[in-house]
């Protein structure tokens, strides 16, 4: 029996704040249009997804406000850290995202950035913002589940 090829998925950056501030309705994988120094910085894990979001403009999905720090060994041709980056999605996927975000309070946020077979990918999620009481409620549920797991483990 042939061996399965080893998966190359390697998480480089995660947006943990997004899972706290939003309830994720659906997720989708997208490629990105990058320059040479940007991919080198991504491989060095010099990425911040915290304030990022995706905007649909003129039939294109654009990743905005994501910081990819300058490449340390770069020269005068280094990239702008806050440059807007085009996401590579099929037309149907873009139309689906555009339709979902027409509702009030729905946005698209980057959840995770990783390498897949040498290409940088970003996992984006269609999300609905949580209220403060929803955040507290989800924290309580998580604590209760942790207590239950502890009690079952110590049995």
UniProtKB/Swiss-Prot annotation:
Q: Taxonomically, what lineage is the organism? A: Bacteria, Bacillati, Bacillota, Bacilli, Lactobacillales
The record's NCBIfam families line, in alphabetical order, gives: PRK05422.1 (NF003843), smpB (TIGR00086)
Protein species of origin: Pediococcus pentosaceus (strain ATCC 25745 / CCUG 21536 / LMG 10740 / 183-1w)
Q: Which family does it belong to?
A: Belongs to the SmpB family.
Identify the main location: cytoplasm
**Protein name as annotated:** SsrA-binding protein
Superkingdom of this protein's organism? Bacteria
| UniProt cross-references to Pfam families, sorted A to Z | SmpB
Role noted for this protein: Required for rescue of stalled ribosomes mediated by trans-translation. Binds to transfer-messenger RNA (tmRNA), required for stable association of tmRNA with ribosomes. tmRNA and SmpB together mimic tRNA shape, replacing the anticodon stem-loop with SmpB. tmRNA is encoded by the ssrA gene; the 2 termini fold to resemble tRNA(Ala) and it encodes a 'tag peptide', a short internal open reading frame. During trans-translation Ala-aminoacylated tmRNA acts like a tRNA, entering the A-site of stalled ribosomes, displacing the stalled mRNA.
Q: Does the keyword Cytoplasm apply?
A: yes
- Keywords, ordered alphabetically: Cytoplasm, RNA-binding
What compartments host this protein?
Cytoplasm
Residue ranges for the region (Disordered) are 134-155
Alphabetically, which GO biological process terms does the record hold? Answer: trans-translation
**GO cellular component terms listed in the entry, alphabetical order:** cytosol
Give the InterPro entries listed for this entry: SmpB, SsrA-bd_prot, SsrA-bd_prot_CS
